[in-house]
């Protein structure tokens, strides 16, 4: 498929995608984001600067960060790279919305005490990867979900290690309906 045909390019498209993701998360996981979230469409350079990284473009497609969830006091925002394919943008939104949900529902100090500071990122990122990949399966986007699952399983970072840990407790449902529990159901002990 030609990625540019499905690219999300306008603020209006991003807002619609956010609304779709919010409805899906409520339908699939029974969760709602109950605060206003500012959605910003940014270029890759600005997105990476917000992460404290430098963006170095390459001539070929590369796996890179497409979004970030930001909490500043009681304000929440999601920055998304513009021009990404629709399904990639949707999965990134679900990932970042999972972080917003975590900010709103988890006692971060209790999570750190329970799992240790060294596992904190695995707890957060593992759940967000689980959520985005499971969402793609539930949407019937099996090829995209399977690709993301395989790539994430072999990653040797907090995303991959965390995702594999979540799979142990919350196996993927490969159909278009959930067949078991989700990490959204246990706010004190998600893993």
Q: Where would I find each of the regions flagged by the language model?
A:
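Long, well-structured alpha-helical subdomains associated
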Residues: 138-191
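A metal-dependent hydrolase signature that marks the N-terminal structural subdomain at the beginning
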Residues: 1-64
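Post-HExxH zinc-binding segment in Zn-dependent metallohydrolases
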Residues: 113-154
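Short pre-active-site segment immediately N-terminal to the catalytic Zn-binding motif
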Residues: 73-93, 119-120
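Second-shell loop/turn segments in exported
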Residues: 7-13, 79-83, 115-117
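Active-site recognition of the HExxH zinc-binding catalytic motif
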Residues: 25, 91-105, 125, 129
């Amino acid at each position: 498929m030609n990625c540019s045909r499905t690219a999300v390019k306008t603020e209006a498209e991003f807002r619609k995608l956010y609304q779709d993701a919010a409805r899906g998360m409520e339908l699939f996981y029974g969760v709602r984001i109950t605060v206003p979230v500012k959605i910003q469409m940014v270029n890759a350079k600005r997105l990476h600067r917000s992460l404290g990284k430098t963006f170095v473009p390459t001539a070929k497609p590369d796996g890179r960060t497409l979004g970030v969830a930001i909490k500043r006091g009681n304000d929440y925002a999601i920055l998304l790279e513009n021009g990404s394919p629709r399904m990639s943008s949707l999965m990134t939104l679900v990932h970042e919305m999972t972080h917003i949900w975590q900010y709103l529902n988890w006692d971060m100090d209790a999570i750190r005490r329970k799992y240790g500071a060294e596992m904190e990122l695995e707890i957060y990122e593992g759940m967000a990867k689980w959520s985005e990949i499971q969402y793609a399966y539930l949407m019937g986007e099996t090829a995209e979900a399977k690709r993301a699952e395989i790539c994430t399983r072999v990653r040797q970072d907090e995303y991959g290690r965390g995702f594999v840990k979540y799979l142990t407790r919350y196996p993927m449902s490969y159909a278009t309906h959930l067949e078991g529990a989700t990490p959204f159901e246990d706010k004190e002990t998600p893993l």
